[in-house]
Amino acid sequence: MDAAIQYILYFAVLVVLAVPLGRFMAHIMDGEHTFLSPVIAPVERGVYRLLRIDAAEQMGCRRYLASVLVFSGIGLVALVALQALQSFLPGNPQHLPGVSWDLSFNTAASFITNTNWQSYSGETTLSYLVQFMGLTVQNFLSAGTGIAVMFALIRGFRQVKEQGLGSFWVDLTRTVLYVLIPLNLVFGICLAAGGVISNFQPAQKAELVEPVAVQPNADGGWSVIDGAQIEGDTVKVDGKVVEGARVVTEQFLPQGAAAPQVAIKQSGTNGGGFFGVNSAHPYENPSAFTNIIEMTSLLLIPAACCFTFGIGVKNTKQGKAIFAAMFILLVIFTGIIAVNEHMGTPQLADGGAVNIEMTDGQAGGNMEGKESRFGIATSSTWSAYTTAASNGSVNSMHDSYTPLGGFVQMLQMALGEVVFGGVGCGLYGMIGFAILTVFIAGLMVGRTPEFLGKKIEPGEMRWAVVLCLATPFAILVCSAIACMVPGLADQLNNGGAHGFSEVLYAFTSCGGNNGSAFAGMNCNIPWINVMLGLEMLFARFMPIIGTLAIAGSLAKKGKVAESAGTLSTTNGMFVFLLVFIVLLIGALSFFPALALGPVAEFFQMIA
């Protein structure tokens, strides 16, 4: 019963906060006066004067796209350079060396695309300067870019026989100044007050209560030696000296300005953790209070975008219908994950090895890879939220979820991040499916499809297909190529179906601009870093190209009057059709691959 209340609470908080934020963002899109205008409007005008931006400019789709690509390209180059020169720059109290070329490219591609895939551990790889001047800045700018493209799409539906979609520079500036900075100022203060660390001290060392013996392992790291007898610097097991063993007497305690970066990594659906284990780390997410802030902010802006869309196209029912479709999918997927994690696996219960019954003293179920301070309900909800959005942050280890739990996580990412998805990009991804839905419905009744008063013709359909299939194409092609590389098996912690799931999850995460990982695959080698980086760039910018092409085409068209034969896109039937089409495309595209991974593992589990 307590778990059910938790699930209801998480969903309710999301809906209650998303509605007013959606209205506020609609006002920002049109440059209307808001309660923040007296403070921020002078700053906004100053930015325009400094950068010589014409606030009244109307860009066509090609110029808008060129601005997006040039801006992102500059960010890519700057972030690569910042990492490469890390050892020569200030703000590096640990004296960390420069980052290798392949990891620099992978990380830069990851953060400018809002993916935040991490082939590294933040506390041991990147300096404070790179973290806040490089990664945190891109967290704001990549999120702002996604929202700006969504604004352009809204104007495409709203304009009548016009060329302009607004100005990318104005949309980006307003989004960052009015939405992202104020929102994350509040979140950052709340997180710091809740115990998330925020300082610029170098890492600390603490004496262990008891020394620990470790030895080198096959992965190049160190493993604890069970049953070791420690005599000074000598380690023995069963009276025999263990060669190459070390005695650890100190613990490494990382520090840094985590709270501000955690705030934007959540609300901007970025997801890249300040620490290697992300929001499972007690310095990044220490309590239930910080957890609900981080988890709610994860989907807040993507959910609000639905209501912004409805207000922007002057059809609030349409925004509610899109929200309903996304919300239904989220509830279904969260339920599947939760049920499987609460049930656990036969192997856990075999012979009474683990008590998987829920009691007052324990969560029961599959607690492997989950933090005891969060339990199954909170961990399952977070995993559903983070793979629904293009976020990828974690408060538990997805590699340790049950086969069907991992199946749902992969499926949500594989759908193209349309179950709310990323800030801005989730909305325009779902609009691609909505256009596909009205086209299929039009074929069934023999009418030219219409959506929001605009005729959907072959040009829009071609780009809608690109929008819907860019992610599946990137994921499946890159996964197939990787599986043909002979050395891939050496980078996996597991073989068989779960090993394939680790590969598929990595490429699904990057292709879906998500960034989470099963973490059972060593991705920090040159060819994998480069392949994942290229996949992230393709999967980010191909949908943007398709979205702006659709927006530019629709803006030139006139409005079509509704008639008795016009398909309603705001009722329950359309919501059902939209959900069905999303699941159908996902099933047709990914079931063969998923059958070789999590589905096969599920049948092995119950055999």
Q: What does each model-identified segment do?
A:
Residues 1-607:
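Membrane-proximal intracellular helices of multi-pass ion channels
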